[in-house]
Regions:
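Bacterial Sec-dependent N-terminal signal peptides
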Residues: 1-22
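Extracellular, repeat-based ectodomains that mediate carbohydrate processing or recognition
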Residues: 21-175
Length: 175
């Protein structure tokens, strides 16, 4: 029994020392009047593509704000976009994803609103296109946007079209 306890102590020490150290990297000032930047149903507010990390949030003025940094860097490049979000409704979260070609895709400000979607003008860029439709169908009443990356780099975009209890799940594929 004594040896079993010693073995467990050594194993737990080995596992605890093998864990990666976490590091906090400040980004920028953001809206903090409610949970819109941190709601539990928010999907992909921080994504990594190769050695570049991207982040999206609403700043204190309610502007959709994007950032990127190299993984080991502590300084973020921050861009305030021309797009606004209703920061007073925590449903209006932002979702981002980078596709297999390095383009950043962004969806924001949805709580029964028309689809707000744009993507970067070039790979790894923080500059966005104007608002774009995806398919043009079922894009007038969107809530809960979520991007998912497929193993081949293509994207799946999900959202609810319609009201609570009377909506449909919409799934778009981006290739």
């Amino acid at each position: 029994m004594k040896y079993l306890c010693l073995l467990l102590c050594f194993l737990s020490f080995g596992f605890s020392s093998a864990q990666a150290q976490s590091k906090t990297v400040p980004v920028s000032e953001a809206w903090a009047g409610n949970s819109v930047n941190a709601v539990v149903f928010r999907k992909n507010s921080l994504v990594t593509y190769k050695n570049i990390q991207f982040i999206a949030f609403y700043n204190q003025k309610g502007k959709l704000t994007l950032g990127k940094r190299k993984l080991n860097a502590s300084k973020w490049e921050i861009v305030e976009t021309a797009f606004n979000g209703n920061i007073h409704d925590a449903h209006n979260c932002i979702s981002i994803m980078v596709d297999g070609d390095g383009f950043l895709h962004v969806s924001w400000d949805h709580h029964g609103n028309p689809l707000n979607y744009a993507h970067s003008v070039a790979p790894l860029s923080l500059q966005l296109t104007d608002k774009l439709p995806m398919t043009g169908l079922n894009e007038t009443n969107a809530t809960y946007p979520e991007f998912y990356k497929m193993p081949n780099g293509n994207l799946i975009f999900l959202y609810r079209d319609g009201r609570s209890g009377k909506g449909n799940l919409v799934m778009n594929r981006y290739d």
